[in-house]
């Protein structure tokens, strides 16, 4: 069941289209991640949904209730939309205790004092902060402040929760912990959530679906697996993961792509829907984990192309190499026990790839 409908929303700042004729749906109980680079319109879109930005055109409905319609002249105020919002900087009142911060929306709604206390206690228990209700924001860690902001956003039992990069100010370990905590709470309460982030790992870890935004538009939607395995455009292929994007042409028979600038390099690929595209240019995305490296003294790989290791970065769980084959640079992710030196010549074997055509469309493979 669809919870939120966004139809043809546009938001302008002068001549700049921050959101450009965007349409999007959110399902009941779903966590949808809006993933994109800085300046692509992610936060502006949240502002339009929450009512703190006014679009120039389009329509937004939540649970069957129209929140905004340019055509009908409808603009429901933010406080009447039943939407919770967690901002990037948390926006906690520094002169209020945790209890007072969480209770503030209830106080504004004139909820009786006794009922307020019960609701605040329940919501702080939800984020495991009930024992710190008497503290002030500056007495809390970043993760605790984030949980207070989340508790406050949930205190009015919203129909929709919006998260605007709330984890970006946390250190890496705490960020991973909070990803799990937010997801656990979302699933426990069956919340409908839109989570904005520029962090692809965060989107992959938390979301049921991902919508990739670029220049004010959603250019691809799908599950994390679909987005990662089948990018539809060169931008998605380069933004999600660390793909190497190569240009090539389909060889006779269609089982390989001949890469421009590397005479011996053939990338294996299945192209059943591109039989008519022989000798026409195609873009190929190759993920680092889909390339194997072999030492030159390994006999069974003599027929493979060779390259020179130009760079290596130790990542702990793996080593990220850059290798050069003729004029082509390819990234390779290898096990830390597979050690190759910069300047060493190696065999390499791309095991699979994703093909993106000139129009930005990619076949499902």
Report the location of each language-model feature:
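Glycine/charge-rich catalytic "coupling/switch" loops of P-loop NTPases
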Residues: 256, 261-311, 338-365
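Helix-to-loop junction immediately C-terminal to a conserved catalytic motif
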Residues: 50
């Amino acid at each position: 069941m669809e919870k939120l409908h966004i139809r043809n929303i546009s938001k302008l700042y002068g001549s700049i289209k921050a959101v450009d004729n965007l349409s999007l749906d959110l399902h009941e109980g779903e966590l949808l991640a809006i993933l994109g680079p800085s300046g692509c319109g992610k936060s502006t879109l949240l502002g339009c949904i929450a009512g703190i930005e006014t679009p120039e055109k389009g329509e937004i409905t939540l649970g069957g209730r129209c929140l905004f319609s340019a055509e009908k002249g409808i603009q429901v105020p933010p406080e009447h939309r039943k939407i919770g919002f967690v901002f990037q900087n948390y926006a906690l009142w520094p002169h209020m205790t945790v209890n007072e911060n969480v209770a503030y929306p209830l106080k504004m709604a004139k909820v009786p004092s006794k009922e307020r206390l019960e609701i605040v206690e329940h919501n702080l228990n939800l984020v495991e902060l009930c024992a710190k209700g008497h503290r002030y924001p500056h007495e809390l860690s970043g993760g605790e402040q984030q949980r207070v902001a989340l508790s406050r956003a949930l205190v009015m039992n919203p129909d929709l929760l919006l998260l605007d990069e709330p984890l970006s100010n946390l250190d890496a370990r705490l960020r991973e912990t909070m990803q799990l905590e937010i997801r656990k709470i979302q699933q426990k309460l069956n919340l409908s959530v839109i989570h904005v982030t520029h962090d692809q790992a965060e989107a992959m870890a938390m979301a049921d679906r991902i919508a990739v935004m670029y220049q004010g538009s959603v250019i691809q939607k799908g599950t994390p697996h679909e987005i990662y395995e089948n990018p539809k455009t060169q931008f998605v292929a380069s933004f999600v993961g660390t793909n190497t994007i190569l240009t090539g042409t389909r060889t006779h028979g269609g089982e390989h792509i001949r890469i421009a600038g590397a005479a011996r390099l053939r990338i294996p690929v299945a192209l059943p829907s591109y039989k008519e595209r022989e000798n026409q240019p195609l873009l190929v995305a190759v993920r680092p984990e889909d390339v194997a490296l072999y030492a030159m003294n390994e006999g069974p790989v003599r027929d493979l192309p060779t390259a020179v290791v130009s760079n290596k970065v130790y990542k702990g769980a793996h080593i990220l190499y850059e290798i050069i084959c003729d004029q082509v640079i390819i990234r390779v992710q290898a096990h830390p026990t597979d050690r190759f030196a910069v300047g060493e010549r190696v065999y390499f074997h791309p095991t699979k790839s994703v093909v993106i055509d000139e129009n930005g469309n990619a076949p499902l493979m």
